[in-house]
Amino acid sequence: MKTNEHDYYSQLANWSFNEINYTSKNYTNWVYENEIKKHTKKDSKILDLGTAAGEKVLKRFPECAEILGTDFSEEMIKVANKNLKESGRKNISFRVMNNLEMDTQDNYYDIVTARHTVTDPKQIYKTLKPGGYLILRGVDKLDCWSLKRMFNRGQAFYDKKPISLVDYEAALNAGFKDVELIPLHVIEYYKTKEDLYALLIKVPILDDLTELKQNEEWERIPIEKDLFEKYVAENTTKKGIKLIRRYYGIIARK
């Protein structure tokens, strides 16, 4: 895990978006949670990497023999365990683990899931049973591209190769078979500019989390009010303030 990413996400104790008012429309059939359900059996063991506060696991993952959710942020895991108690769900646990320094058993899990987080396919391959699946959903380079271009910065803004291709090639190099890469197109509409601003404060859309050189310190650049207002003015529709999202899905078999 890059130091900048660790510091950024460690500051967030709340990964819920319930307070942000928006609607979304998917333009691709592939749905991350549906793929997980499709491959889950009653005796399946699932490892969810980058689980954050566990909301997705608790609300959308199917019942099975065992689910472990991990995150490198202690604050996130504290909230996840609190959410677990309130949910009443069984056979689920949460603990701290760095995705790039996995300490899970070899050949143990039937499915490893990862949503919007850094992964190491070689370590995932080791912890999966033969025939097990990696199911991944990520944020691609062209996500919110018109917004990033207006601010001339943002997550993956200067990357030469899209992260979707990086992850796809990494899965192949790790030894996975039947690796499939699916582009995911979504348009979101935010009810007010305050809702959009709340999103930009919470997630690193406009932040460059590229690792810095030794002794350099990463500081978050404040959102320029004039550029933000310009984007809102140019993208306000009857449905709300438009934000074009670009994600990707990967499913691979060991």
Question: PLM features: residue spans?
Answer:
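Conserved Class I S-adenosyl-L-methionine
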Residues: 180-254
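A short glycine-rich, Lys/Arg-flanked "PGG" loop and its adjoining helix->strand segment in the class I
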Residues: 121-133
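A short SAM/SAH-binding and catalytic strip from SAM-dependent methyltransferases
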Residues: 110-122
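Conserved class I S-adenosyl-L-methionine
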Residues: 1-40
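Short, glycine-/aromatic-enriched active-site segment of Class I SAM-dependent methyltransferases
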Residues: 140-159
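Class I SAM-dependent methyltransferase SAM/SAH-binding core
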Residues: 47, 52-101
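A short acidic, Gly/Pro-enriched loop at the edge of an enzyme's catalytic core
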Residues: 102-111
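Short alpha-helix
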Residues: 160-175
